[in-house]
Design a protein with these regions (language model features):
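Short, Lys/Arg-rich, polar N-terminal cytosolic tail immediately upstream
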Residues: 1-9
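Juxtamembrane "helix exit" motif at the C-terminal ends of alpha-helical transmembrane segments
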Residues: 25-43, 169-190
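Short, Lys/Arg-rich cytosolic juxtamembrane segment immediately N-terminal
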Residues: 8-18, 152-160
Length: 336
């Protein structure tokens, strides 16, 4: 049975929160094992301490601004006179989302892509490439802007930044514990009695296992959360535009665009609506921050009650003053 729009949105939110909670649990488990190895009677201090550390890191991430990201991308602030259609579309979607109008930035790049950033929903920023403005029609541009507006409304930027930094603590703690064991021996200092010593050894073994597995699982969970937030932004965009086909067509055009991104940077690649220069492999589904585009398109078209193959229709004529549409072509399927 197909999910309704609200059901899909709620499902994606639940999934992302569950996955994020598992990362916090992994962090707490690793902290417990480390403390239990050296102070078995105070293992609970490791649990509380590691989770408190994660909270502090998350709060620090909350105060990081978007200026560095915009600088890396080479974005410039747009004006209404220079990009009237983009300005109008952003304003429309801000009204639909019930948010203040975000600042608009343009990236001088012939490829098609876009991202959102900002500390909180009322301080949002949307950046798009010049290639996107030239190659998408108004419906498709509206779908892309709605997707980025949804990231702002859903507080995804702050959520994912905090999550990434919290997840990043896990390999740091794991590496620290392995080094401590390497120099101090299995189980560290023994307790005053045999029971404490045995418990310390158990914690040490568990800690070593977690040191190997926890960083891998944390990374996979982080990537899974990112994919869920992309699905959530797609569904929320459909809610804002009431026209899922616009975003679906835009996603396919962006994916099929042969122009490489000149301003490509690995530090910001996960922020874009479609990951630039994404390499496909057997493990692409697990190691990708974004869902497969065909899966996103199918989900969008199911919301519209349409067949996923039907959306690549000719682009209708645009009114005077709108973005000039590219020549009408039949879009081929995306090849693996």
């Amino acid at each position: 049975m197909k999910k309704t729009l609200q059901e899909q949105i709620q499902s994606n939110r639940r999934a992302s929160l569950i996955l994020a909670s598992l990362i916090v649990v992994l962090l707490g488990a690793l902290g417990t094992a480390i403390t239990g190895t050296y102070a078995p009677d105070y293992w609970w201090a490791g649990t509380l301490g590691s989770m408190a550390l994660g909270l502090i890191v998350g709060l620090v991430a909350n105060f990081s601004g978007p200026s560095i990201v915009l600088s890396i991308a080479g974005a410039r602030e747009a004006t209404h006179a220079q990009d009237q259609v983009l300005d109008n579309v952003v304003e429309e979607m801000a009204i639909a989302a019930g948010l203040p109008k975000p600042k608009i930035y343009v990236i001088q790049d012939d490829t098609m892509n876009a991202f959102a950033t900002g500390r909180r929903p009322n301080e949002g920023v949307i950046a798009v490439t010049t290639g996107l403005l030239r190659k998408l029609d108004r419906d498709e541009l509206q779908g892309v802007v709605a997707h980025e507006m949804s990231h702002i409304r859903n507080d995804d930027i702050r959520f994912m930044t905090s999550l990434a930094l919290t997840a990043g603590l896990i390999p740091l703690l794991a590496d620290m514990f392995v080094r401590m064991q390497w120099w101090g021996g299995l189980g560290g200092r023994r307790g005053r009695d045999r029971n404490s010593g045995d418990l310390s050894t158990i914690f040490a073994v568990v800690g070593l296992l977690l040191s190997v597995l926890a960083p891998l699982f944390a990374r996979l969970l982080e990537l899974a959360v990112s994919r869920e937030r992309e699905y959530l932004a797609d569904a929320s965009a459909a809610e804002l535009t009431r026209y899922p086909e616009g975003l679906a067509r835009a996603l396919r055009k962006i994916t099929l665009d042969p122009v490489p991104m000149q301003s490509f940077n690995r530090a910001t690649q996960t922020m874009y609506i479609v990951k630039p220069r994404a390499l496909k492999s057997r493990w692409a589904g697990l190691s990708s921050t974004h869902p497969e585009v065909e899966e996103r398109i199918a989900a969008l078209m199911s919301l519209a009650g349409s067949d996923p193959e039907r959306f690549s229709r000719p682009v209708p004529p645009m009114p005077t003053g709108a973005i000039e549409a590219p020549p009408v072509v039949e879009l081929p399927p995306i090849l693996d």
